Amino acid sequence: MAFNYSIANTVDDAAQSIAENTSSLATFSKPPLVIAHRGYKAKYPENTILAFQQAVKAGADCVETDVRLTKDEVVCILHDRNLNRVFGVDVDVRDLDYELDNGHFRTIQEPHEPLPTYEQFLHELTKHPGVNLLVDIKPVNDLLIIPRMVDAMLRVNSDLDFWKDKVSFCLWSHRFIPACDRYAPSIPLYHIGFNFAYAERHFVMHPRVKGVSMAVALFLLPHSQDFVDLVHAQGKQVFAWTLNTPSSIYLALIRGCDGLLSDDPVMARALSQGPIVTKSWHYFHYSEWLHMIYGFLRAQFVFFLLRTFVL
């Protein structure tokens, strides 16, 4: 299996690149955005109104969430295709009649929150000026999800431009761009991905795309700095996900990422404002680096599957 970007031949190659970036690290002109991944997932049931509220209370600049479309075409907030992991109910979201069935669903994790809709999230968002919602639109979604999302937005506020500085659509696949152009022309777009070449080919140069959000393990690659510099040269942002260890936050910071997606926004904020970037790569436990290398290999495999069957 061949990939456009392969992992460094040895951990030392990646470490040398990291060390070179650390030694020449410039002072940030402004601190990176802290983005709460699925809300305050580290402490509260993921992708719930409570997790959203607590993320904002904890000081997150943005909240990232996921959307899925039910059988009755309700856009709900859910990461997995199946409800079993979070709600303990073995049902595919595409077989769910939200209006009929939702009253039965509560998260396994206490305090047992209900499955929210995108529209409910938007109502909550309007209570928090200055907070942006990043909406992860999985590539396995039907394109119909875009107009249904817009319908929900217009029900909350009939002026679509009201949302342009509050909501961003985050796309894995370029197949969704025409639907966004048709139904949501004023809503900012971001790319979420596993592969620099795909991101550069379909998103980095696109005039509507405001930035990219890449798996943090990709930033182990020495030439990842070239990608970051390319995106920044277009006046766009680079985010990294998901940063739940000191070493992952360190890696994102020394590469110059503008946004840090983390399950724990309090931890991410504290580390991003501390002296972490003055450390050397070997300051962090080797198991964290090994975990990221595994994450890189896994990301490349998943990208191969997506490119073959979905993208």
Swiss-Prot record:
Q: Which residues form the GP-PDE domain?
A: 32-272
Compartment list: Mitochondrion membrane; Lipid droplet
Q: What EC numbers are recorded for this enzyme?
A: 3.1.4.-
Membrane association type: Single-pass type IV membrane protein
Q: What class of enzyme is it?
A: hydrolase
Show the stretches that span the lipid bilayer: 289-310
Tell me a GO biological process for this protein: glycerophospholipid catabolic process
> Mind listing the GO molecular function terms for this protein?
phosphatidylglycerol phospholipase C activity
Q: Which reaction does it catalyse?
A: a 1,2-diacyl-sn-glycero-3-phospho-(1'-sn-glycerol) + H2O = sn-glycerol 3-phosphate + a 1,2-diacyl-sn-glycerol + H(+)
Q: Which InterPro entries match?
A: GP_PDE_dom, PLC-like_Pdiesterase_TIM-brl
List the GO cellular component terms: endoplasmic reticulum; lipid droplet; mitochondrial membrane; mitochondrion
UniProt entry keywords in alphabetical sequence: Hydrolase, Lipid droplet, Lipid metabolism, Membrane, Mitochondrion, Transmembrane, Transmembrane helix
| Annotated Pfam families | GDPD
CDD domains, per the entry: GDPD_YPL206cp_fungi
Q: Which domain of life is it from?
A: Eukaryota
Q: Report the sequence similarity comment from the record.
A: Belongs to the glycerophosphoryl diester phosphodiesterase family.
PANTHER family the record matches: GLYCEROPHOSPHORYL DIESTER PHOSPHODIESTERASE, GP-PDE DOMAIN-CONTAINING PROTEIN
The record's function comment reads: Phosphatidylglycerol phospholipase required for the removal of excess phosphatidylglycerol (PG) via a phospholipase C-type degradation mechanism.
Q: What is this protein called?
A: Phosphatidylglycerol phospholipase C
Q: Which organism is it from?
A: Schizosaccharomyces pombe (strain 972 / ATCC 24843)
Organism taxonomic ancestry: Eukaryota, Fungi, Dikarya, Ascomycota, Taphrinomycotina
